[in-house]
Regions:
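Metal-dependent nuclease catalytic cores that hydrolyze phosphodiester bonds in DNA/RNA
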Residues: 1-111, 240-256
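Short coil/turn segments at secondary-structure boundaries
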Residues: 26-29, 67, 207-217
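Alpha-helical scaffold elements adjacent to nucleotide-binding pockets in ATP/GTP-utilizing enzyme cores
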Residues: 53, 136-140, 188, 192-195
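Mg2+/Mn2+-dependent nuclease catalytic core
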Residues: 78-184
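Hydrophobic/aromatic-lined pockets within catalytic cores
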Residues: 142-149, 201, 222, 237, ...
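Polybasic (Lys/Arg-rich)
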Residues: 188-212
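Extended, structured, electrostatic nucleic-acid-contact surfaces
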Residues: 215-238
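Accessory alpha-helical DNA-binding modules that contact the DNA backbone or grooves
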Residues: 235-274
Length: 274
């Protein structure tokens, strides 16, 4: 196993917040991830291209770079301190061993506007479909504020559904200010550092607990070698959270539970195949 690094990333923080086991594995298995699939490489490529399109809207912006995280953090602080007004790409912040990078930072006097660029189309931030994007941005803002930067405004840039080939580049993004939604999450994150650090610094992996997200988790078979036998995840449209909490794991466990006709047929088919 690779040596565990001290600094905690956004991905590790958010993963641990949702599932202690996932966060621990993410932190302790750095460098052990399998090679990217073609689909994953393609998503990264598209994300990079979209990020560049966002930067193009700030032709005088400055890219922050360095040989490692610490150098990027130091360069960020120096650049922001010596500039009265400016735009910065890939600025990095660190506070109490938590690190975050921002796609775009605008500095106006003594205040900052953090922008995160997404490669998906616009999401409703008041619903579950948009929550992960707000959580992602809130982490960056939380770390930046802890590092001493006065972040007063935050925005998410999504791909505009109205953009058409040939339109001006300024129409490519749907720009949503989400300062209020982010500000509501920052105090929640303020209560998390001690427990998250304790989890990640523990040499023992936390005991996994089945949750809804296990279905698509990269580590589901590592946590549960018999995961394929947990057939409750194969039932369509099922709100699995309450059933998992009650100890139900298989289609057989769902016999007699309140299900719609489609779910009942799925349960019967799964049981017949066992």
């Amino acid at each position: 196993m690779q040596e565990v690094t001290h600094m905690i990333t956004k991905r590790e923080f958010l993963n641990t917040n949702g599932c202690a086991t996932l966060g621990w594995l993410t932190h302790h298995q750095k460098g052990e991830r399998p090679p990217l699939t073609f689909a994953q490489e393609n998503r990264f490529y598209i994300g990079t291209r979209i990020g560049q399109k966002a930067r193009d809207q700030f032709p005088n912006g400055q890219l922050i770079s360095g040989i490692n995280n610490q150098s990027v953090i130091a360069t960020t602080r120096m650049a922001l301190q010596k500039t009265q007004n400016g735009v910065f790409f890939e600025a990095a912040f660190e506070a109490n061993d938590f690190i975050a990078k921002a796609d775009i930072v605008r500095k106006i006097g003594t205040v900052y506007h953090i922008i995160e660029v997404k490669s998906s189309t616009e999401k409703d931030l008041s619903k579950s479909e948009g929550r992960e994007y707000v959580e992602d941005l809130a982490y960056t803002v939380w770390v930046a504020r802890k590092a001493g930067f006065n972040v007063e405004k935050t925005s998410l840039w999504f791909l505009s559904k109205d953009y058409r080939l040939g339109d001006h580049a300024s129409k490519l993004f749907s720009k949503i200010e989400c300062t209020q939604a982010v500000d509501m999450l920052v105090p929640v994150y303020d209560s998390k550092p001690n427990s998250i650090q304790a989890t990640l610094q523990n040499t023992n992996q936390p005991t996994p607990k089945p949750i809804t997200d296990c279905k698509n988790c990269d580590f589901n078979h590592q946590c549960y070698p018999d995961f394929d036998a947990m057939t409750i995840y194969q039932i369509p449209g099922l709100r699995t959270a309450k059933h998992l909490e009650a100890g139900r794991r298989t289609a057989q466990d769902m016999v007699g539970e309140k299900l719609n006709d489609t779910q009942k047929r799925a349960v019967d088919c799964i049981i017949d195949q066992v």
